[in-house]
Swiss-Prot record:
Acetyl-CoA carboxylase is a heterohexamer composed of biotin carboxyl carrier protein (AccB), biotin carboxylase (AccC) and two subunits each of ACCase subunit alpha (AccA) and ACCase subunit beta (AccD). It is an enzyme of class 2 (transferase). One of its GO terms (molecular function) is ATP binding. The gene is accA. This is Acetyl-coenzyme A carboxylase carboxyl transferase subunit alpha. GO terms for cellular component: acetyl-CoA carboxylase complex. Belongs to the AccA family. It catalyses: N(6)-carboxybiotinyl-L-lysyl-[protein] + acetyl-CoA = N(6)-biotinyl-L-lysyl-[protein] + malonyl-CoA. It comes from Chlamydia muridarum (strain MoPn / Nigg). Pathway: Lipid metabolism; malonyl-CoA biosynthesis; malonyl-CoA from acetyl-CoA: step 1/1. Pfam families: ACCA. Residues 41-291 form the CoA carboxyltransferase C-terminal domain. The keyword Nucleotide-binding applies. Gene3D superfamilies: 2-enoyl-CoA Hydratase, Chain A, domain 1.
Length: 324
């Protein structure tokens, strides 16, 4: 597993404890109570490091190569999954995976953005950057869910919509705008979870829902830290400053009324314990579905409409107000 800079001290300590345990099998260098003390110290070290992460370090966790992807969540959460492909206009976009899913006996339409897990699959999935046909595919499946009375789960994980010439020629902006318009009035419950990167319109095109949640170390922003740094300072070394200024993580966005919930990750991030992460996301989805399933359609749509009409809280100082 690839090590992030802030993880090195923890891994070295874990290796030391593992070495002691191995040597103990032959020589009994340390008693079990002494080993336990070392493990307790390791727990305190982890708590100290992971409770004081900078926004940029959390972005690195969010982008970790071993972080679970949409396909992993499908395997970890669903008893059944039948994939559906194509947008019925141009082609299938592998950056979107969607289909009929069964979770704890309840049927859903699960639609997620997929980056891939190695060089070959990442190139095949275009690194999770959707083309117009990806947004059209997602909307086609969402409308199918509405037709069959199925709740929808959107899993968001993209560095942004594909910015290439071919995507623009096929109507990238139009495809995203159409999704915003159509999903806002879809007559079935929609639950959105940002599981990794949630960047710009590429994320928003699949993030219109009745509830929007984020994993603890995921981010949701109008631009990546690198993009922000290149525009504001023209200096890639300012990525860390940009990540802090963008307020792109769950606790800030919940305070701004942009997301509704932050789902806790295992210590160190989802890649350290994927199974526990699948369980947390599954619990959240089922819990929210129970709240939404009996709402009259008119009330469901009105609440969704008002949610996005009033999204975001901000304050103005009394000084600026008086000047105005």
């Amino acid at each position: 597993m690839e090590l992030l800079p802030h993880e090195k001290q923890v891994v070295e300590y874990e290796k030391t404890i593992a070495d002691f345990k191995e040597k103990n099998k032959e020589n009994s260098l340390l008693s079990s109570s002494e080993i336990q003390k070392l493990e307790n110290r390791l727990d305190r070290l982890k708590e100290k490091i992971y409770s004081n992460l900078t926004p940029w370090e959390r972005v690195q966790i969010c982008r970790h190569p071993s972080r679970p992807r949409t396909i992993n969540y499908i395997e970890g959460m669903c008893e059944e999954f039948v994939e559906l492909c194509g947008d019925r206009t141009f082609r299938d976009d592998p950056a979107v995976v969607g289909g009929f899913a069964k979770i704890q006996g309840q049927r859903f339409m699960l639609i997620g953005q997929e980056k891939g897990c190695d060089t070959t699959s990442r190139m095949h999935r275009n690194f999770g950057m959707l083309c117009p046909e990806g947004f059209r595919k997602a909307l086609r499946l969402a409308k199918m869910a509405e037709k069959f009375g199925l709740p929808i789960i959107f899993l968001v994980d993209t560095p942004g919509a594909f910015p290439g010439l071919t995507a623009e020629e096929r109507g990238q902006g139009w495809a995203i705008a159409t999704n915003l318009f159509e999903l806002a009035r879809l007559a079935t419950p929609i639950i959105v979870v940002v599981i990794g990167e949630g960047c710009s319109g590429g994320a928003l095109g699949m993030a219109i829902g009745d509830v929007v949640a984020m994993l603890e170390h995921s981010y949701y922003s109008v631009i990546s830290p690198e993009g922000c740094a290149s525009i504001l300072w023209k200096d890639p070394k300012k990525n860390s400053d940009a990540a802090a200024m963008l307020k792109m993580h769950g606790e800030d966005l919940k305070g701004f009324a942009i997301v509704d919930a932050v789902i806790k990750e295992p210590i160190g991030g989802a890649h350290h314990n994927p199974v526990a992460t699948y369980r947390s996301v599954q619990e959240y989805v089922l819990q929210e579905w129970l709240k939404l399933k009996d709402l009259p359609v008119e009330e469901l749509l009105e609440k969704r409409y008002q949610k996005f009409r009033t999204i975001g809280l901000y304050e103005t100082s009394s000084e600026s107000s008086s000047e105005a």
